[in-house]
Amino acid sequence: MARKIITVFGGSGFIGRHLVRRLAAKGYAVRAAVRDVEAAAHLKPMGDAGQVVAWPADVKNLASVRAAVEGSYAVINLVGILSPWSKQTFDRVHVDGAKNVATVVAALGIKRLIHMSALGASLESESRYAQTKAMGETAVSDACPSATIMRPSVVFGPEDRFFNIFASLTRFSVTLPVIGAPIMPKIELGGEHGISIDFFG
């Protein structure tokens, strides 16, 4: 029996590689849709031979999105940037890219699309990052109303770029300042159950 295919845009990123491993363990065939397939070569051993494939794709290019998505059972879009560079602008990645993925998913009749946005996504925000994340949500909802949109806060786990920075700082300082904050959700990758969602603050 053929494995169901799940395409993961941004599969070589921090969240992506944990998700790819989890999906492969569940028995799915995984297409890790990435701009640099060589940088995603480490994903292949996460499954049986041929189960995990690094697939060349750019969310800004509609044709490459369609090629990556065709035949998929489900699609997950994790693509996002924290700061723009060259042709990778917030608008092109968070809005145009998100719209391209959702448009193709709807056109091909794929029933399941999960889109990763961000906590604080808002058109009223002073941050262009948050503004474009909100614009991307609208584009996804308009193109594919059945899509599931997630708004995670801090995502942490092995090799993350958040808590591990603080861990490295403890090597140079006995104390670290801790700033109070409201309660907010967090997502932890790894552990006994793979992914957990909780609240902290």
Predicted regions and their residues:
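SDR active-site strand-loop-helix element
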Residues: 9, 33, 78-79, 113-119, ...
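Structural motif
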Residues: 5, 73-74, 112
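Conserved beta-strand segments of alpha/beta enzyme cores
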Residues: 29, 51-53, 146-148
